[in-house]
Amino acid sequence: MASREDCVYTAKLAEQSERYDEMVQCMKQVAEMEAELSIEERNLLSVAYKNVIGAKRASWRIISSLEQKEQAKGNDKHVEIIKGYRAKIEKELSTCCDDVLKVIQENLLPKASTSESKVFFKKMEGDYYRYFAEFTVDEKRKEVADKSLAAYTEATEISNAELAPTHPIRLGLALNFSVFYFEIMNDADKACQLAKQAFDDAIAKLDEVPENMYKDSTLIMQLLRDNLTLWTSDACDEE
């Protein structure tokens, strides 16, 4: 079996060459090793899975949009073909989400010894249940949405108690949790409230941000503000 250092180095090579499936396999090996992940390893694992799932989520959105267009045209034959193709993508999405959630729950959370790593992995758990909710329906959708809500809520409790309002992980959690409320729960008010609170809390402490976190923190704050602008203008349009 390859050493930890070799796995991490190979994961970096895979990232450079945009071979994200291989990057996932390398970082899964590291996650299954005895020691807790370092910050660098944690970020590599997150990037690997995010790219794999990101490509599949993009495919699913394109196919779903095409399906609606063909339905509107009344083109039943094409709709049938698209539905079969969409089901194939959904099976891949489901496998990917199951895979990352298993790694988080069996390897990463049990070894997480700092508040930072606990929040990071609980947020990640919330994210992948949220991705599950994007393409599922009925009871399955409710089940994964509930699990996403529970993971985000637990992460938020730890984050609010232990991490500074300007910490990039705390801000990233607020960003994704607010997206969950907006997209999965269709609760724009709650989404805006959460995003605004996180943004305001961070602004109040902006002069205390460590130099090494400033760029990441302000980038996520900008994303929070962008979403708030978008969501509040949507609400105005609907009125």
UniProtKB/Swiss-Prot annotation:
SUPFAM superfamilies: 14-3-3 protein. One of its GO terms (cellular component) is cytoplasm. One of its GO terms (biological process) is signal transduction. Signal peptide: none annotated. It comes from the Eukaryota. InterPro entries: 14-3-3, 14-3-3_CS, 14-3-3_dom_sf, 14-3-3_domain. It holds the Pfam family 14-3-3. Probable adapter protein. Belongs to the 14-3-3 family. This is 14-3-3 protein 1. It comes from Entamoeba histolytica (strain ATCC 30459 / HM-1:IMSS / ABRM).
